[in-house]
């Protein structure tokens, strides 16, 4: 963020709003925005923030609008939008408002750049066609910190797939050059997959970040388990070969925000979808679907993450959940939001702008039922411990299972694009150790169990909990195991709590049973060391056993997954409290 724009935002704050902004630490919801995240946010030179999009009334009637905030996103006012530019990037060095459009508002035959030196509401901005090929998923313009170069990214489609494109100008948008990169690697059919993911036309949606003078990094969406990246050391003219990154995420879109002090903020979905089933035994799919053209159902778009780099992207801290899909547990997930909410209901896709006092405003998600604006303090990503006592219920864990509902993969169903309805894999129940006396402190705790039910795609009950990433640390869970066993998994990414392969695909996993621990609440503690590939397990500080790591971990541990995976039905386990901390 340009420091003049940061200063302008700060000057608009009253003492009361300044105090409110400074008091925010953990991510705080501030708006349901009018458009899916990617390029809705724009900052004016006087510090106002706009969010452009479409308002839909209860009858399905749509109208262009923008929301405007005069206090760094703490509150918003809606306006009807009849402007031409809409979302823009302001270039202070030129006093220019600039954007790119394709396949919208009649500009369907190529890629167009719009700019104005008068203001964002200019009714007659300059318009020029810069490429004859239509593009999609355009990201906002960025201005180099080291030169007059401006650039943006998009993707174009041919008969093979979506290709990543980088467009740049050295004269503030008067003329443009562009580079098209090759296709990235695709998912291969390797067990536990028995069918193909969405691997053709899943998008590249390239995200660009300037690391230093002439050095750029591109983070690219694809169908494998990880994002791929490539770098340019000549300002974007030529690019390296693709390399696999330490950012997990399948068929989702990331965002990189260079900060005014040189740090970089990364936003993405550090998630793993369920293994693909044999699509030839699945109803409602076309032959193209079965070969990996388009998706059947998304199972990794319910958790959003953030990390921060102090060294130009060489290493990252945090790996923290910043938001969980508010409808992730809905049994009518496909219908949540009503008849006009037919699209994806996810919290993938991101945009962010820097705010004063070390805060950021984050846009994330798709569909009005799921998408949000958040304000977060960057210090949140440097925390080294976390505690969960479930006083707020299941707000801070993922626990949903999937029903054998329609998936809406081909748009034939009335609602729910590429979605399955959900079922709770954990519930809040009375603490079974409460003595029942009135006036005696009592509370509810989490119950997870396994129940064979032919309505479910997998019967495993569990919870998935995030904490600050570390390579060496301690995690504990206060549990009451009522029958059979409970599986513990430490992982470097989010898994569905109903995924039976979460343990085998993670660095550390083990089970404890009723022979290992007493029939009362016991604190199971795991001390792990990623570099040593070894973990120690204790029950109420009594050593139980070692666990050897099963694979290399490029980042660190940031997840505890508790699952009831026994044979047949089980009464399961109660969970009262979770704790995690880094060990230096």
Feature locations, PLM:
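Extracellular Ig-like/FN3 beta-sandwich strand-entry sites
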Residues: 470-472, 519-521, 557
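Beta-strand-rich interaction surfaces with strong enrichment in secreted/lumenal proteins
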Residues: 243, 461-467, 510-516, 549-550, ...
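Flexible glycan-contacting loops in extracellular carbohydrate-active proteins
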Residues: 544-577
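Short tryptophan-centered beta-strand motifs in secreted/extracellular beta-sheet-rich domains
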Residues: 475-477, 519-537
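Asp-box/BNR beta-propeller blade signature and adjacent active/binding-site loops
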Residues: 1-398, 402-426, 430-431, 452-454
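Extracellular carbohydrate recognition and processing domains
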Residues: 325-333, 508-522, 546-552
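Secretory/extracellular carbohydrate-interaction modules
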Residues: 435-513
